[in-house]
Amino acid sequence: MKKALLLFSLLCVVTCSTVPGTGRSQLNFMSSSQEMSLGAQSYREILKGERVIKQGPDAEMVQEIGQRIAKSAKEYLPQSDANKFRWEFKLIDDQAMVNAWALPGGKTAVYTGLLPITGDTDSLAMVMGHEVAHA
């Protein structure tokens, strides 16, 4: 039992890394490149089953807000993985879904059902910024 505890403790120490910006330690069981690859794969799979709006004022708004957030993330945390992300921001046509989400690597989606709730670009930017923090 002591050997197992020692081995587990060693594993936790070895897999810890420092979070840019906060300096806190976090436990990582996979590399950031593995996370980004998994995020990109999951993003493609999810979007296959959704109707993505590619043009129009709402899609342009999501893109513009997303690109501004991505630029800020790169500038604010230059030493973070945000500079390695292949940022994508999609608008999914689903009025019943009041949600947005982000996956590792900067893969982000906003549902059209969220737009009437947020009401303006500032509120949508706040929601998207929150989601991007999960990426």
Predicted regions and their residues:
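C-terminal motif of bacterial Sec signal peptides marking the signal peptidase cleavage site
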Residues: 12-15
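Positively charged n-region of N-terminal signal peptides that target proteins for export
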Residues: 1-4
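Peri-catalytic and regulatory segments of divalent metal-dependent proteins
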Residues: 17-133
